[in-house]
């Protein structure tokens, strides 16, 4: 449903959802309307998952405090400095921008190094950082290929992958 914070909009005959975040928002613990989540259960376990959406940052947007965008998650959907347990009961892969507007992927998973997930810059083949251009529509796509688990254990087989595209161009490929 529509609220003052969210509206269904039409742009070039395409419908979308416009979200406006209150000043000072950095996540759900900062108050009403400070996060967007779409939750659902898959009808069956999945080996590969995709998410793709279009985003337009308004002109004059101030990137200086950084920010986060939706991604994919499974199981306990770890985040917020909660490092996943070694039993492989959850993960999350989301997108963020830094103070300079550069785009990064961050992921919570069993083998992450720090408490706040591992981070990888989105960049082209020349290592030029990817950035959202205010006033322009961008298409963000993420693909997750999950590791399979060895029977009778919680150990992954390390054949998973995290891939990302910006406007149809691959800008991140991580495998394990």
Where are the regions that the model predicts?
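Low-complexity, Ser/Thr/Pro/Gly-rich disordered linker/stalk regions
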Residues: 1-176
